[in-house]
């Protein structure tokens, strides 16, 4: 019995070391303010919180953490309010939610879509080459849109 336990342990260590790999990442800070958090990943509210919330007032600069393209933009009176999703070459995507407004280029794009659809609420999926962003590029400003209880940036990294 002990032989099988030792064998199983060795096999688990061997296979887990093959599967585990590290990817060094050095992201640009998503917000131009001290990293004071008002909400953390996994805390339970009415459901589990899926990101981190950076405290701050409305209108604080929000930046792309890495090069990529905007793969989704939404404006809604509920949920994330004004939100940007960026897909990065490393396979991650980053989410920036409850924005008070978008950067001028994104704002222009989304306003034209709102007028075209005659709706405040829009959900757009720009093509990969349509809205490229660079690491550290301004994408919006912190806010209190959607289902939010105070100005902040809700931020997520997804894989």
Language model segments and positions:
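Bacterial Sec-dependent N-terminal signal peptides
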Residues: 1-25
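Surface-exposed, glycine-biased beta-strand/turn segments
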Residues: 20-93, 100-102, 120, 129, ...
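Residue-level signal for short segments within beta-strands and strand-turn junctions
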Residues: 88, 157-159
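Histidine- and aromatic-enriched segments that form or immediately flank copper-ligand environments
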Residues: 92, 96-101, 105-114
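Surface-exposed acidic, glycine/proline-enriched linker/cap segments
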Residues: 106-129
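Histidine-centered catalytic micro-motifs
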Residues: 150-157
């Amino acid at each position: 019995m002990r032989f099988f336990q030792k064998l199983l342990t060795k096999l688990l260590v061997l296979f887990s070391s093959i599967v585990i790999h590290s990817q060094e990442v050095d992201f640009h800070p998503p917000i131009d303010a001290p990293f004071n958090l008002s909400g953390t990943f996994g805390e339970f509210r009415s459901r589990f919180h899926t990101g981190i919330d950076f405290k701050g007032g409305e209108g604080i600069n929000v930046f792309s953490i890495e090069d990529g393209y905007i793969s989704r933009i939404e404006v809604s009176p509920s949920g994330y309010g004004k939100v940007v999703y960026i897909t990065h070459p490393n396979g991650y995507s980053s989410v920036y939610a409850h924005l008070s407004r978008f950067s001028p280029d994104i704002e222009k794009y989304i306003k034209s879509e709102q007028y075209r659809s005659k709706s405040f609420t829009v959900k757009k999926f720009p093509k990969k080459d349509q809205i490229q962003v660079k690491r550290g590029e301004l994408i919006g400003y912190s806010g209190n849109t959607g289902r939010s209880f105070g100005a902040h940036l809700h931020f997520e990294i997804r894989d």
